[in-house]
Amino acid sequence: MDALGLSKLRHLKPRQLLSQVLNFALILSTAFMLWKGLSVATDSPSPIVVVLSGSMEPAFQRGDLLFLWNRNLELDSPPTPGTRVGEIVVYNVIGKDIPIVHRVVRKHQGPKTPLHLLTKGDNNHADDTELYARGRWYLDREKEVIGSVVGYVPFVGYVTIMLSEHPWMKTALLGIMGLLVIVQRE
């Protein structure tokens, strides 16, 4: 019991304990505000995603951390949601919560119709029409695309993959972090 520092927890005064709990809440709320600020700056509901499969190899490996941008990348032109063929986008299929990272292989847009995209994983043999919502042959750029990939950090996302595949690790990690914040004195 003493190895975890729980004996120190008993000796904390209520005011010290409350201070440590509030410090932990401050850390969590700061992380949340940074995430929301990044979401606003990138115009993306999820500005950072992790590659979950090998469908984009060799460009991206499973566990790579991707940075997304959903604003116009060309600063000298008027803002448009233009996406080029060959660009790598991340999208959510309507009704599913898993972000998919694939390359745009074709685009269609009429004078009065929204931009529609056809995507395909670099390591896949066929395009993504099987992944789209039933009866859909293309993605609606405005409604389904989360953002375009502008950078990445290799393998850093494996931490989130491990926490998703082993829920007990998430609980243990949060418990240890909370305990360290409460027990540690400044």
Curated annotation (Swiss-Prot):
Active-site residue list: 55, 102, 128
Gene Ontology CC terms, in alphabetical order: signal peptidase complex
Reaction it catalyzes: Cleavage of hydrophobic, N-terminal signal or leader sequences from secreted and periplasmic proteins
Cell location: Endoplasmic reticulum membrane
Primary location: endoplasmic reticulum
Gene Ontology biological-process entries: protein targeting to ER; signal peptide processing
Similarity annotation: Belongs to the peptidase S26B family.
Annotated protein name in UniProt: Signal peptidase complex catalytic subunit SEC11
